[in-house]
Amino acid sequence: PVSQDALGEAIRTYLLENPDVMAEVFENTQKYLIAEDEKRQSEMLKKNSDALYNDERDFSIGSPDAPITIVEFFDYNCGYCKRAFPDIMKLTQKNPDVRVVFKEFPILGPASEQAARVALASKGDGKYFAIHQGLLNARGSVSGAALSSLIEKHGLNADEIVTRGKNKDIDAHIKDVRNLA
């Protein structure tokens, strides 16, 4: 029988003399890892499909029956989210077969959390999208007096909306979105 040391040295020598074998092993490993990741993502999407696409607490634009649904997790103080908003609007206007579901994901601090709560609290008044647009179109962070002004600009009582935004249903919704993300 061949000793373990001798076998190890033979394998090492072979790999050093044939580096293409290691490249092939690396390539196959990459393919395997990518396939496993895609499988995991697919399973996650199936498991969370209703929470992603059909949560009645979320606001969406486009036909509910659209064959294509985009789910956007966003923060009102995220510069990338603000820059993407006009493109998302153009996409939905030019493509009636696209629906966008908006998921408040306030991760950039207390001002983000308050903005998300205000937007969600305004949904019952039919003003969610107007507030949403105002927050995403604003330069920089919107909080304090600027947030109150935005709320009142759309015919709502700022103190009432801020208070409504602090309820347990909105707490649960934001928590659920964070867990989903």
Question: Language-model segments: which ranges?
Answer:
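Extracytoplasmic thiol/disulfide redox context detector
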Residues: 1-110, 166, 170-181
